[in-house]
Amino acid sequence: MSFPNGIYGKYGFEKDTTSSQKHVLGTRMELPDGRVFRYSEIGGADIAAGAVVQAAAGVAHDQDLVVAAASAGDTTVTLSGSLTITKDQYKDGYMHINSGAGRAGQIYRIKSNTAVASATGCVLTLDEEDGLETALTAGSGNTEVGLSVNTYSNVRLQQ
């Protein structure tokens, strides 16, 4: 099975815009002359052709988050801290494990997430068939995770 992260396009494809997602964010497209473009989602106002853009800033309160217990092989992780997160805010982004014996340094791609508003219980669905490599333990001082949006999500004009 193949999972290409690059496509080849014809001249003019770099100008295509869509109102719904057609590729994985960050997909690399190369034109016949060697120019390369990345499939991105624009945040806020329209951006003129040729403008230099940058990734959205990270969300400070979405680091060092406490999780509910999860078993090895699980494909969902529930965050137990009080958060405000919109539905699929972290889609195509990453969950990285900050702490916990034998777990620190692991990273998982996020397939989707539920919305919560100043509440606990945001559920992350991992984009990994085999699920978690090791179990996660609940409670402060045990497993803590951080969330990162996809670099190509909600790009903005460079400041």
Protein language model regions, located:
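N-terminal low-complexity, intrinsically disordered "leader/linker" segments enriched in small/polar
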Residues: 1-68, 156-159
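Short linear motifs in intrinsically disordered/low-complexity regions
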Residues: 17, 63-65, 75, 114, ...
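Cys-His-centered catalytic/binding microenvironment captured across papain-like cysteine peptidases
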Residues: 26-27, 123-159
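Ser/Thr/Gly-rich low-complexity blocks that favor extended beta-strand/coil architectures
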Residues: 42-47, 52-61, 80-122, 145-158
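N-terminal, intrinsically disordered, small/polar-rich Type III/flagellar export signal
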Residues: 64-70, 103, 108-117, 127-142
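Short alpha-helix capping/helix-loop boundary micro-motifs
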Residues: 74-85, 124-133
